[in-house]
């Protein structure tokens, strides 16, 4: 748990409670902005993270997820007046900031726009960046909410522009708060109004050493990502999640019928994002290496468990599903992607092509059995050579024995 304490701005008060940061790089924020009379004028509670793609000095591309940058400040956050609407402004490191602007109409108020600024000159976050400086991405939202209603959106919302993907979830916000009291009337976003069936989850009973109870093979689903009118990423797979939290092991089969896919495709990276009523996001990030092969580089997950807690893990240093560009990777047998000690993904009937998809169809597949063959060939050759060596030695000793026997007879 990392706590940030904010101090009052002249003319307003601001309280930011502790940030609880899971293994995934995200910010959980709760904000209470007060006016000069110490009455609440704006309330917000939300989670967000940012994924940024940038070019390196060797002309390759990297993808990073923005993480904690130290002490958070709030310069520029205001309740609003007759000339300016309310604004939430958060700074979390030199050159890193996020702003949300609100406007008001006769009977509604709007989350008008958000902007995110990041500093590629920060060598810790953006190692080997080719271009250094502060870049800003602006997004117009115009989300209209009835006055004196609290806006809620637990579902994942994704904003993608240029090389930045912004993720928001568990959002609660009310601007133009009346009489200093946050409303109990909630206005839901469209995604929260649509109920979906949750995937089946099995959790074992806690014990000193718990292991997941074996489950049936998960159903394979087909997922795709489009770039305009063209399909740029294809994936077919059955997914089984193995999660360990607080010595409790869970096995979760992903139901493809209630799982939605989104993502993005770029020249050197591709993202497949899955979400459902319990999975905020399950990201598979692919990358190009040596300009002629692709592989699974990163997996990020954040999801609700049956006990109501949120499980979040990220690993951007993986190396799975390696295949030549222009082909697909296929593995019908069960495989395990080990994301961390607490999280593994079992895949079944896997086929994936994150780059160079043509006419919405898979290209020729490289089968995972080829990897096994590559491993077995040197073993087989070594065994054969060992066998030949043994035969030569046996022949030598037999010949030597007969030679000595001839001398004894003479």
Swiss-Prot record:
GO terms for cellular component: autolysosome; autophagosome membrane; azurophil granule membrane; chaperone-mediated autophagy translocation complex; extracellular exosome; extracellular space; ficolin-1-rich granule membrane; intracellular membrane-bounded organelle. O- and N-glycosylated; some of the 16 N-linked glycans are polylactosaminoglycans. Keywords: Autophagy, Cell membrane, Cytoplasmic vesicle, Disease variant, Disulfide bond, Endosome, Glycogen storage disease, Glycoprotein, Lysosome, Membrane, Signal, Transmembrane, Transmembrane helix. GO terms for biological process: autophagosome maturation; cellular response to starvation; chaperone-mediated autophagy; lysosomal lumen acidification; lysosomal protein catabolic process; muscle cell cellular homeostasis; negative regulation of NLRP3 inflammasome complex assembly; negative regulation of protein-containing complex assembly. Residues 400-410 are cytoplasmic. Residues 199-221 are annotated as: Disordered. It holds the Pfam family Lamp2_2nd. Residues 401-404 are annotated as: Important for binding and subsequent lysosomal degradation of target proteins. The keyword DNA-binding does not apply. Belongs to the LAMP family. This is Lysosome-associated membrane glycoprotein 2. It comes from Homo sapiens (Human).
């Amino acid at each position: 748990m990392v706590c940030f304490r904010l101090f009052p701005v002249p003319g307003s008060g601001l309280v930011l409670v502790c940030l609880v940061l899971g293994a995934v790089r995200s910010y959980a924020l709760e904000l209470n902005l007060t006016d000069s009379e110490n009455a609440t004028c704006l309330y917000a509670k939300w989670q967000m993270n940012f994924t940024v793609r940038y070019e390196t000095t060797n002309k390759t591309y990297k993808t990073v997820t923005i993480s904690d940058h130290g002490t958070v400040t709030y310069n520029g956050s205001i309740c609003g007046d007759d000339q300016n609407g309310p604004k939430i402004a958060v700074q979390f490191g030199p050159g890193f900031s996020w702003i949300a602007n609100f406007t008001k109409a006769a009977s509604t108020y709007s989350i008008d726009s958000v902007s995110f600024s990041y500093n590629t000159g920060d060598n810790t976050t953006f190692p080997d960046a080719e271009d250094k400086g502060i870049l800003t991405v602006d997004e117009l939202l115009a989300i209209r909410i009835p006055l004196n209603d609290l806006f809620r959106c637990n579902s994942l919302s994704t904003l993608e522009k240029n090389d930045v993907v912004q993720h928001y979830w568990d959002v609660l916000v009310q601007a133009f708060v009346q009489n200093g009291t946050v409303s109990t009337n909630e206005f839901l976003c469209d995604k929260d109004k649509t109920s979906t069936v949750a995937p089946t989850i099995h959790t074992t009973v806690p014990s000193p050493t718990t292991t997941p109870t074996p489950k049936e093979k998960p159903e394979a689903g087909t997922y795709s990502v489009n770039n305009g009118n063209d399909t740029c990423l294809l994936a077919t797979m059955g997914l089984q999640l193995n999660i360990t939290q607080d010595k409790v092991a869970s096995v979760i089969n992903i139901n493809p019928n209630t799982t939605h896919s989104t993502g993005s495709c770029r020249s050197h990276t591709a993202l497949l994002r899955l979400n459902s009523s319990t999975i905020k996001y399950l990201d598979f990030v692919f990358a190009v290496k040596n300009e002629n092969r692709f592989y699974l580089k990163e997996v990020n997950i954040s999801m609700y468990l049956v006990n109501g807690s949120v499980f979040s893990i990220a690993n951007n240093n993986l190396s799975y599903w390696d295949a030549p560009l222009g082909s697909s990777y296929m593995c019908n047998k069960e495989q395990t992607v080990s994301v961390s000690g607490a999280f593994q993904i079992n895949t079944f009937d896997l086929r994936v092509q994150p780059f160079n998809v043509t006419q919405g169809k898979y290209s020729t597949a490289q089968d995972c059995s080829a990897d096994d063959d590559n491993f077995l060939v040197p073993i087989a050759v070594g065994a054969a050579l060992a066998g030949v060596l043994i035969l030569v030695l046996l022949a030598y000793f037999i010949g030597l024995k007969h030679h000595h026997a001839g001398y004894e007879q003479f």
